[in-house]
Structures are given as C-alpha cells and as structure tokens.
C-alpha cells in the first residue's frame, strides 16, 4: 500500500511553496511542467491559467495569505484548505479585466526571465528584488485591484478588511 497518494499533475501546473519567508512581499509562485516531480514542500494547482497565476501572485492574495496563513517559526505556511480554498476571488471580472490581469501576469514572468541565473528565492528577496520585477508586480496589482472594483488601498489592513467583507458575503450565500 502507498504511504501517501500520488500528487503528480499530468499537465502544466502552478507551484506554491508551503512555507515562504515573512520578509517577502510576494510568495514566489511558478508554472511547472509534468516532468518536474512534485515534492511535499509545495502546493500545486493543476491546469492553472495565466489569470490564476496573476491573481495568486498579486498583493490582494498575498495580503489574504499574510492575514490567515499558519506559521512555521515566523514564516508563512501556505495551506490549500485555509488560504487557497477560502480566498475570495474577483466576482465576475469582465473579459477586459481578465485580459489585463493576464497581460500583467505575463509581464511578471517576462521580468523573471531577464535574470536566468537567479532563483525565485533570489528574485523575491526584498533586499535584492530587481526593480523591473517589482514594477511588473505593481502593474499586476493594479489590474487585480481593478477586477475587484477597487483602485487603491491606503493600508494592508484596509485591503484585508475588504477581503474579509467579500468572504463574509460568500459565507452568507451558503446559508
């Protein structure tokens, strides 16, 4: 008998580290192909789209993660059950908004390719994050915020309060 079920996706997928430094502004998420073997230190999202990558890589999702994720020492512990499954995604974004998120998400991926000798840990170190990558993320954040019907948030607490309001609305629909 197997000790654990086989989790290897059969198609392209997103990798999200289970544990990520508390110092990072963005959890480093990446696309992977089925030939890359999944270990137990990551969460996977099979068949994820560029839109999915964009929303999950945004400050909106990272703020949610920082507020509800568990901790391993002081680092964030990303959980599918708590963080991902309870995240309030943009409700009914327009095709134009989806396209803007996809374009901005692609710009994040393109910015990363400018540094082929750098690991994701290097790229997302807050002390050495390349300005071009940070700018791409900021553009993505604007596109994701727009899909939520917002143009800006003054603080992370304001952003999290907004997300919890959406979450409460989702819970109310279940009752």
Can you say where each PLM-predicted feature lies in the sequence?
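Polybasic, glycine- and aromatic-enriched phosphate-binding surface used to engage nucleic acids
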Residues: 1-103, 107, 170-174
